[in-house]
Regions:
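PRPP-associated nucleotide enzymes
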Residues: 1-125, 130-217
Length: 217
C-alpha cells in the first residue's frame, strides 16, 4: 500500500471520520462502516484533510485553474481547506458553496463565496459517494450556473458500490455527467489496511459480505 494511503486511513480513524458498526447511508442502505467528514473538529484536522485533497488534485489535475464547490454542509469546510492547501502549494483557486435555504435578504442568492462565470470550470469537493445521490443533487443546483462546466469531483473514499444499476456509483456519475470522480482511497485499500491486524477480522468479514451484495459489478 502506498504510504499516503496508509497515512490517510490512519488519519480518518484517528479523527473518528471512519467508523465500523451498523449505519444507514443517505441512499438508505444499511452499511457496515461509515465515513463522516462532520467528525473533523479541529484546525489541525481540517488542515490535514485539505492537504490530502490538494495532493489528489495535483496528482489528477496538475496546476489546472478551477473553482472549488463544496456542497452544504460537510463540503463547505472540505472545499475551503482544499483551497487553502492548494494556495500554500502555489495554486490560488476560488471556492464557493450553496445555502440549504435560499436567502431573500442582504446579498441574497443560492451561493456563498465566488460565483463562477460563463466559461469557468468547477471541481466538486465531497466526502464520499455511496449511490451517487449527493452528486446528483449538486448537479441539479449547479445547472443554474449558465456556461459553467463541472470537470471533476474529488472524494475521500470510493465505497466501490453499485449505484442505481449494477454499475459502480462513480461509473454511473461519470457516464451520466461526463466528468471523472477521483478518491484518495477506496474500500479495498481500507480492507487491505485492516487485514494487517487480526483483531480487525470481524470488520473485514462484514465489509466483504456487504460488498458481495452491494459492490459494483
Amino acid at each position: 500500500m502506498e504510504a499516503y494511503k496508509r497515512e490517510f486511513i490512519e488519519f480518518l480513524q484517528g479523527a473518528g471520520v471512519l467508523k465500523f458498526g451498523d449505519f444507514t447511508a443517505k441512499s438508505g442502505r444499511k452499511i457496515p462502516y461509515f465515513v463522516n467528514a462532520g467528525m473533523i473538529k479541529t484546525g489541525d484536522q481540517i488542515t490535514k484533510m485539505g492537504e490530502f485533497y490538494a495532493k489528489a488534485y495535483f496528482d489528477k489535475l496538475g496546476k489546472k485553474q478551477a473553482v472549488l464547490y463544496g456542497p452544504a454542509y460537510k463540503g463547505i469546510s472540505l472545499s475551503i481547506s482544499a483551497a487553502v492547501a492548494l494556495s500554500k502549494n502555489g495554486l490560488n483557486v476560488p471556492f464557493f458553496f450553496n445555502r440549504k435555504e435560499v436567502k431573500d435578504h442582504g446579498e441574497g442568492g443560492t451561493f456563498v463565496g465566488y460565483v463562477p462565470q460563463a466559461g469557468e470550470e468547477i471541481v466538486i469537493i465531497e466526502d464520499v459517494i455511496t449511490a451517487g445521490t449527493a452528486i446528483r443533487e449538486s448537479m441539479e443546483i449547479l445547472k443554474h450556473l449558465d456556461g459553467t462546466k463541472v470537470i471533476a469531483t474529488f472524494i475521500m473514499v470510493d465505497r466501490k458500490e453499485k449505484g442505481q444499476t449494477e454499475k459502480g456509483a462513480m461509473q454511473e456519475i461519470e457516464e451520466q455527467f461526463g466528468f471523472p470522480v477521483y478518491s484518495v482511497v477506496d474500500v479495498y485499500d481500507i480492507i487491505e489496511y485492516l487485514e494487517e491486524d487480526p483483531a480487525n477480522e470481524e470488520n473485514v468479514t462484514r465489509i466483504k459480505n456487504y460488498l458481495a451484495v452491494n459492490g459494483a459489478k
